[in-house]
Amino acid sequence: MFLTVDELYTHLHDETVAVISRDTEAIPVAAIDAAIAEAKSYLHDFDTAAIFSAEGEARNALLLLFVKDIAVWHFVNLGNACIDMELREKRYDSAIAWLRLVQKGDLSPDLPPRTAELGHESPIGKIHFGSNSKRGQHY
């Protein structure tokens, strides 16, 4: 798994997580899943399956930091127990701004590029070139 609930403790105190989640792991796991889905939507030019299946040191540290920020934002929206919402909102906005820059191509993170699937001629880059099928005219 790309991000675990225990890794959220670098961004939130454990008692805060316990209060909001009411001691169940379903709520933080749902926030993590939502954060990963949101990050994937911005990283369509990259191999998201490889990126988000990485574990440990194989993960991109900057992307991990921003996915944590997004997950914490989704998580703390459930309740504001001891949370500085302005700080969380700024960190969330910063993460989304970074993902948008990557999406536009202004930033080039150290992530694996997307490759073409076997048997499919789907475009890999931003532009797809092609032509119409050849026609034969008979009179």
Model-predicted regions and their roles:
Residues 60-70:
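Core structural elements
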Residues 8, 69-73:
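Oligomerization/assembly interface segments of phage tail-like spikes and tubes
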Residues 36-43, 67, 75, 79:
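Short alpha-helix boundary/capping elements
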Residues 73-139:
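Short loop/turn elements at secondary-structure junctions
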Residues 1-61, 122-139:
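Conserved short "hinge" loops at termini or chain/domain junctions
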